[in-house]
């Protein structure tokens, strides 16, 4: 590995967005913006993907901690050079034609005597159509048809489940598991006792020793159903344990195929760390592989064709939005702040991975802006800022006035002004959607977030390790789930009256669980690198302090158990019956939680943009699917 040479950095003014006019010409500045965000390293460092900390001498002569984060991987010139033919009107017209044809398929399987209807498999046909359009990312076009299909299936549901057709007396595991998952996700009341009948005399799920493709598919649907369990559902927990072991064993025995790839994907990403667009890309690839090996039926062929066209049309929009994001990042002056992580492309990948509705560009772009500031503040409070500077910045945010910059060090002034301008701008955007002023919500979330970070900075400066409970209470806020969620969802075309917002925002159980899961999962992936940077307090170290004699493995096992329990509790908060707060109102906040969880699946995919992260950007944003 090469060693980076130590060379003085030339002074270069930071040009923040708030000093750019509407014509993109620099405004006259009353004061110069210092280059204190540029650091001269106090020692040579090895060029690698590690995040070990070193000290740095900033331009104001202050010795500072830095995280040695790798630079932005996505050059703005490269982003601006992206192009796609799929924005042409001919592709939109093709999509409209295919949408009409797929609606006709839905209608034909709903007709009492339609040619596609058989009394022995009509229920399974309805469920398969719903499952396919959702996994292929085209369900937004068929909400009415989905409701009709699920109502039809539910009308035949019994305490023993269902068979593939309405005339089939005996329920089967495949149709029951698929139906259970889809119906529960769409708000129908479902009881897990329906799976008790599939147990043998020993209380285990009964299945033959022959692993046929049909049986494996049944267990795969059982596994998918088990992932939306509630905390008290013992039979669902048993189903998850059984199906996980069964599918892992199946992967060792069946040949590499589209089925094996589907199993591997579902086992890897489960549900709570899955991104809908990644699932869509993966499922398109699976069906494309099937199409090369066998003749697809007419329904699947039409669905696949529409999915590919829709994927690529949105891909064209993604590239245009990403260009806007990259220009905003470049003009904001952020590239000159060398102590921060520049992950605007990764943030955009996350948000476009959870919301593929074309008309929601404002939501996606502003989500990136908020997350970018969260990252600046994270790196400023975690490493670069001194404790006295951070106290000044926290107090300035509470004042929420441009004049508050007078007491700030130079490098913080530009950050403060840009944060102030952006949060106010987003509040104005939210007013258009919500019809009321939401700035106070945003300010309170920001103040709470910075307060939690200041507390952690004080712990670092004093070497204090809190109790596990004290750490987690603070960590739920510093996880940034609330601040990353609140303002963006208020810009959606979805009303969030106060009674709905209080079910999602602080201090709701939903917000508490989402913040806790993110903090716990993040710590299990980051604690070793954080410790190398001098940050001793983590949920692992706090657990070990509370439990003398325990090992890191003990702590990780305990925390992973907490995460699994809290995931089931979050399932309930999302899916519980509530006429006043429908699932659709909570879904975006939940999906943001899924997206953030995704990047901590194996390691910290933000701080170190590893191969999984880069491949995700390529597969879901940069590349279209082959037509």
UniProtKB/Swiss-Prot annotation:
Pfam (any one): Terpene_synth
Cofactor: Mg(2+); Mn(2+)
Cited Gene3D superfamilies: Farnesyl Diphosphate Synthase, Terpene synthase, N-terminal domain
Main location: plastid
Binding site for Mg(2+) 2: 378, 382
Stated induction or repression of this protein's expression: By jasmonic acid (MeJA).
One cellular component term from this protein's GO annotations in UniProt: chloroplast
UniProt-annotated location(s): Plastid, Chloroplast
GO BP: diterpenoid biosynthetic process; green leaf volatile biosynthetic process; monoterpene biosynthetic process; monoterpenoid biosynthetic process; response to jasmonic acid
Annotated cofactor note: Binds 3 Mg(2+) or Mn(2+) ions per subunit.
Sample GO molecular function, one term: magnesium ion binding
Transit peptide, UniProt annotation: 1-36
Residues the entry annotates as binding Mg(2+) 3: 530
Keyword set, alphabetical order: Chloroplast, Lyase, Magnesium, Manganese, Metal-binding, Plastid, Transit peptide
Catalyzed chemical reaction(s): (2E)-geranyl diphosphate = (+)-car-3-ene + diphosphate
Uppermost EC category: lyase
Residues engaged in binding Mg(2+) 1: 378, 382
InterPro entries: Isoprenoid_synthase_dom_sf, Terpene_cyclase-like_1_C, Terpene_cyclase_plant_C1, Terpene_synth_N, Terpene_synth_N_sf, Terpene_synthase-like, Terpene_synthase_metal-bd, Terpenoid_cyclase/PrenylTrfase
Pathway connected to this protein: Terpene metabolism; oleoresin biosynthesis
Motif (DDXXD motif): 378-382
Function: Terpene synthase (TPS) involved in the biosynthesis of monoterpene natural products included in conifer oleoresin secretions and volatile emissions; these compounds contribute to biotic and abiotic stress defense against herbivores (e.g. insect attack by white pine weevil P.strobi) and pathogens. Catalyzes the conversion of (2E)-geranyl diphosphate (GPP) to (+)-car-3-ene.
Note on domains (UniProt): The Asp-Asp-Xaa-Xaa-Asp/Glu (DDXXD/E) motif is important for the catalytic activity, presumably through binding to Mg(2+).
Family: Belongs to the terpene synthase family. Tpsd subfamily.
Additional free-text comment from the UniProt record: Expressed in both resistant and susceptible trees.
Name of protein: (+)-3-carene synthase 1, chloroplastic
Gene this chain is encoded by: TPS-3car1
């Amino acid at each position: 590995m090469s060693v980076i040479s130590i060379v003085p950095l030339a002074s270069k003014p930071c040009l923040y967005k708030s000093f750019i006019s509407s014509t993109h010409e620099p405004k006259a500045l009353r004061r110069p913006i210092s280059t204190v965000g540029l650091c001269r390293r106090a020692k040579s460092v090895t060029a690698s993907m590690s995040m070990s900390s070193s000290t740095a001498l900033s331009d104001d002569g202050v010795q500072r901690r830095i995280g040695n984060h790798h630079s932005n991987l996505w050059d703005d010139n490269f982003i601006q050079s992206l192009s796609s033919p799929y924005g042409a009107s001919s592709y939109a017209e093709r999509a409209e034609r295919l949408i009409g044809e797929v609606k006709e398929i839905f209608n034909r399987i709903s007709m009492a005597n339609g040619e596609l209807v058989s009394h022995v498999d009509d229920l399974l046909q309805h469920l398969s159509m719903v499952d396919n359009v959702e996994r292929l990312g085209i369900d937004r076009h068929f909400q009415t048809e989905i409701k009709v299909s699920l109502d039809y299936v539910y009308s035949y549901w019994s305490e023993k489940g269902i068979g593939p057709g309405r005339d089939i007396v005996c329920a089967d595991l495949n149709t029951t598991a698929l139906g259970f998952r889809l119906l529960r996700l769409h708000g129908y009341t479902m009881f897990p006792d329906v799976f008790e009948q599939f147990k043998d005399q020993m209380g285990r799920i009964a299945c033959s020793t022959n692993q046929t493709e049909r049986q494996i598919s049944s267990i795969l649907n059982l596994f998918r159903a088990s992932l939306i369990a509630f905390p008290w559902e013992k039979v669902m927990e048993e189903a998850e344990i059984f199906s996980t072991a069964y599918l892992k064993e199946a992967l060792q025995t069946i040949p590499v195929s589209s089925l094996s790839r589907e199993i591997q994907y579902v086992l890897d990403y489960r549900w709570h760390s899955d991104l809908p667009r990644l699932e869509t890309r993966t499922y398109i690839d699976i069906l494309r592989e099937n199409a090369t090996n066998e003749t697809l039926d007419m329904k699947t062929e039409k669905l696949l064709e529409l999915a590919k066209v829709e994927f690529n049309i949105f891909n064209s929009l993604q590239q245009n939005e990403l260009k806007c994001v990259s220009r905003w990042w470049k003009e904001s002056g952020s590239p000159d702040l060398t102590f921060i992580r520049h992950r605007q492309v990764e943030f955009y990948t996350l948000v476009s991975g959870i919301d593929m509705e074309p008309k929601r560009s404002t939501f996606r772009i502003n989500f990136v802006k908020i997350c970018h500031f969260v990252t600046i503040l994270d790196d400023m409070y975690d490493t670069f800022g001194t404790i006295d500077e951070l106290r000044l910045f926290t107090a300035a945010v509470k004042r929420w006035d441009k004049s508050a910059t007078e007491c700030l060090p130079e490098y913080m002034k530009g950050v403060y002004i840009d944060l102030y301008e952006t949060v106010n701008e987003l509040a104005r955007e939210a007013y258009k959607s919500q019809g009321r002023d939401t700035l106070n919500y945003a300010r309170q979330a920001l103040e709470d977030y910075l307060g939690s970070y200041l507390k952690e900075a004080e712990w670092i400066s004093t070497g204090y390790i809190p109790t596990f409970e004290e750490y987690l209470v603070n960590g739920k806020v510093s996880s940034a789930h609330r601040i990353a969620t609140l303002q963006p969802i208020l810009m959606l075309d979805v009303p969030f009256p106060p009674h709905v917002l209080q079910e999602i925002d602080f201090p709701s159980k939903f917000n508490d669980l989402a913040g806790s899961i993110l903090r716990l999962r993040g710590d299990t992936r980051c604690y070793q690198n954080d410790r190398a940077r001098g940050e001793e307090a983590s949920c692992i170290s706090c657990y070990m302090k509370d439990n003398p004699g325990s090992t890191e493995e003990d702590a990780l096992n305990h925390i992973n158990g907490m995460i699994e329990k809290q995931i089931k509790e979050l399932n309930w908060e999302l899916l519980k019956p509530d006429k006043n707060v429908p699932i659709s109102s909570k879904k975006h906040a939940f999906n943001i939680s899924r997206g953030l969880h995704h990047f901590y699946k194996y390691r910290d995919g933000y701080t170190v943009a590893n191969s999984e992260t880069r491949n995700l950007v390529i597969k879901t944003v940069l590349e279209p699917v082959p037509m």
